[in-house]
Amino acid sequence: MNSEIKKVIREEYVKCAASPSYFMKKYCNIQHPKRGRILFNLFPFQDRVLTLFQENPYSIVLKSRQLGLSTLCAGYSLWIMLFQPDKNILCIATKQETAKNMVTKVKFMYENLPSWLKEQNKPAEDNKLTLRLNNGSQIKATSASSDAGRSEAVSLLIVDEAAFINNIGEIWASAQQTLA
């Protein structure tokens, strides 16, 4: 690889590391139900929510369905995993299958990144409920239960579909103590 290409890659890497929005818009692909694999073009409200996530460690988003917020959380999780070593992300949802969908979205985005973004952070563990990179960062999925997240030190906690979790107060009391 010549020095000019290396320079461009280095500059792009720095831009991606500095901005999750830039990273997602430029390099993350998502699965659209009708169009298949497409580039993740964030809507303006998704950009605002992303800023909210970065500026407020405890964010609760009341929203309607099908706004792409789970996909946004997946992209944000992947950005954290790639550019911040040793981060532990936990996704709790009503059912394990729902939580697994978050990990699946992260994996899809990861698998479709250009090789230069993946070469330093290859998967060290990859199964249906976990993706751990060799930089120590990982995302794990679990179902909502009173002991969800116990014995974890969590950098980012995602509670997906929280309105549908029966014992959300008990789960929150348990899970919030895991936040590092």
Regions found by a protein language model. Give the residues of each.
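Phosphate/NTP-binding elements of NTP-utilizing enzymes
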Residues: 2-180
